[in-house]
Amino acid sequence: MPSSSTFLSRFWFIPAALFLAVLVGVTWGNYRFAQENPGGNDFLVHWVGTRALLLEGTSPYSDEVAEQIQTLAYGRPARPGEHELRVAYPLYSQVFFLPFALIADYNLARALWMTALQGGLILLALYGLRLTGWRPGTWLLLIYFLFAVLWYHGLRPLINGNAVIFVAVLLAGAFLALRSGRDELAGILLAFSTVKPQVVILPVVFILFWTISHRRWRVLAWLAITLVLLTASMALFVPDWPLQNLREVLLYPEYNPPGTPGAVFSGWWPGMGERLGWGLTAVLGIILILEWLAARRKGFRWFFWTACLTLVMSQWIGIQTDPGNFVVLFIPLVLVFAVWEERWGQRGRWAILGIKLAIFAGLWALFIRTITDVGQPLQHPILFFPLPLFLIIALYWVRWWAIRPSRLAVEHLQAYDEL
């Protein structure tokens, strides 16, 4: 009788064919969506910018390229007050966009990009389970994966074509590499995550602080080596690209919606909003310094909880960002869920289900109720607050259990000692 391994070796093409069929079906659905729903401006910006450099040798940071992007999006150059749709990522981000920039049909390129982002959301969900050791039951697992793709902070960057989904995957992959001692891989993944530097700057600084406290110098070394190679290789095509990129970064807040809580507060309460923003920055900065010092030389569980807190608080600390980037907060959310089930079992599972439903329905309802239309749906600044506020409260709620060895591990050791 043939073994199962022999059977699989002979009929491996069956699951491969099923996977390919699903991939083609999803891409076809994305293509039809792209045809019927123009947009995906986050992707459009970098698709045009990469093609300009690849086919014309033109810097993606140039005004000429910005006007090309605006014409494709608006049918004309951007008017005062409209989003200028300029390339603001580091030039080495084009590594991600290059395969798609080779496709001249924008709708097809966008459809394939969306398929890749959908794969990224699934991978992020898998990494969340591996990082936290969470083993939800079958029905909760199905809801978990549906939530990962369809919740507001997952589906919106998917539709817009935001590369932040890949940044979240790279961060989660770096955490896994750090836990398993693969420091070289962690450094490389962290370097590539800097394609959206404002999203990862504080988590990367904390990771370096923690790894250096453990004398794990290879993380810093490989991060630096990778960044130097990426920067130098791009300088072969645009020698002064770091200066051009810096100009775009400084220009970015001028044509974007409020990108910090302080900017949001200033719009709501002009008399005191800016001071409130600086006060929030100071409070969060002090908290992070204290938590970083507490995590110094501690084990991975303590480090991981602090990294999740850093990721959440960095969205409010005053660095320019956008609620469209909040998919990076999926991993802290999974940590909270994992601790709840670990501590409270069945009651924890019901709590997880209730919170998922509340987050899913609440964020979408808030977006729909507050949306404005400026040629494309524009989210209200109020979306800066619900998820980070919940996560800060929830992370401190589970802190005691999250930073210590899991209950299952302790019980296993106790049983071993009794033998």
Question: Locations of the language-model features?
Answer:
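Primarily membrane-embedded glycan-assembly and transfer machineries that use lipid-linked glycans
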Residues: 2-178, 183-184, 209-330, 339, ...
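Membrane-embedded alpha-helical segments of multi-pass membrane proteins
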Residues: 115-120, 165-170, 196, 200, ...
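Membrane-embedded alpha-helical segments of transport systems
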Residues: 195-199, 228-233, 358, 362
